[in-house]
Regions:
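Acidic, Ser/Thr/Gly/Pro-rich intrinsically disordered interaction regions
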Residues: 1-49, 67-159
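Juxtamembrane helix-break-helix junctions at the cytosolic face
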Residues: 61-67
Length: 159
């Protein structure tokens, strides 16, 4: 069941300036730390888990329908939802493997973890973050600027 909740302009601005900004900012920051390389195994694992959680939250924000009242979704900010959905890259192509790997190796404690070979445990951070950055840029382009907090523009990919 999908809910099409109407959210006030004030709430959207406040939310984007605090929580949405934070999730994307953290994802970008953790990504940069991971790509620089981390010696300490505990720190690496903590950063990787943070990356997976923040990436999941952002991917859900862009792709999942609103299931529960209060779920924040990109479509709340988009005046032309049809054109947004058409422009959004394929979830299956870019994130289906990420979703499966996330479930199997990070967010579910499962005996299936025993089936993961050592060479399969590596995460291709660049392959995951690249389409997310493009989608964030697309969102900033397609969202109604009157519904976004101005600091959201800081998250645009620098070219």
């Amino acid at each position: 069941m999908e809910i099409n909740e109407k959210v006030s302009k004030e709430k959207l601005i406040e939310f984007s300036g605090e929580h949405l900004y934070y999730e994307i900012w953290m994802l970008y920051g953790v990504t940069n730390s991971l790509l620089k390389g981390v010696e300490d195994e505990y720190v690496y694992n903590a950063l990787l888990e943070s990356f997976v959680i923040h990436a999941s939250i952002i991917i859900d924000f862009f792709y999942r329908p609103q299931v529960y009242s209060g779920d924040a979704r990109a479509v709340h900010y988009i005046p032309d939802v049809a054109s947004w959905k058409e422009a959004l890259p394929s979830y299956d192509r870019y994130f289906k493997k990420f979703h499966r790997k996330r479930n199997r190796e990070v967010v579910h404690l499962s005996y299936k973890r025993l089936d993961v070979k050592p060479e399969e445990k590596k995460w291709n951070i660049r392959k995951i973050i690249k389409p997310i950055r493009k989608i964030v840029d697309l969102f900033l382009e397609k969202a109604d600027p009157k519904l976004l907090h101005p600091q959201m523009q800081e998250l645009r990919t620098k070219r």
